[in-house]
A protein has these predicted regions:
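C-terminal substrate-binding/catalytic lobe of Rossmann-fold NAD(P)-dependent oxidoreductases
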Residues: 1-122
């Protein structure tokens, strides 16, 4: 879920999370944007996800900076992991940290390399 001013859907973070999950699940093949909830609260069903695809729903509501949830569901139970950004300050801090890291690591760099650096120094 993101604020109503965000134009892309699904968000880059949602795509990154989906690709991370798919990398661990060779039995799954890609992701599909299944539902889009507009700022007016209307949910549009865009597509059915094939059984081997990861479904993504995108919601735009109010001024929410960002909420991402991953849900596993079975007949027996459900597990949900959620990250909620309370403000945009965390996004700004991440951008500043990346900007400080880049001069010490010249060349073409990926976000994965930056995240590896962050987690190795945590």
């Amino acid at each position: 879920m993101h604020h109503i001013h965000k134009l892309d859907h699904p968000s880059g973070t949602a795509i990154t999370l989906a690709e991370g999950l798919l990398a661990q699940r060779p039995d799954m093949q890609g992701w599909v944007l299944t539902d889009l909830t507009t700022p007016s609260g209307i949910t549009e069903h865009l597509a059915d996800a094939p059984q081997q695809a990861l479904p993504i729903a995108s919601i735009r509501r109010g001024e929410v900076p960002g909420i991402h949830s991953i849900e596993w569901d079975s007949d027996a139970d459900s597990i949900t992991i959620t990250h909620s950004a309370h403000s945009r300050a965390g996004f700004a801090l991440g951008a500043v940290m990346a900007a400080e890291w880049l001069p010490r690591n010249p060349g073409f760099r990926t976000m994965t390399e930056f995240m590896d650096f962050l987690f190795s120094n945590a």
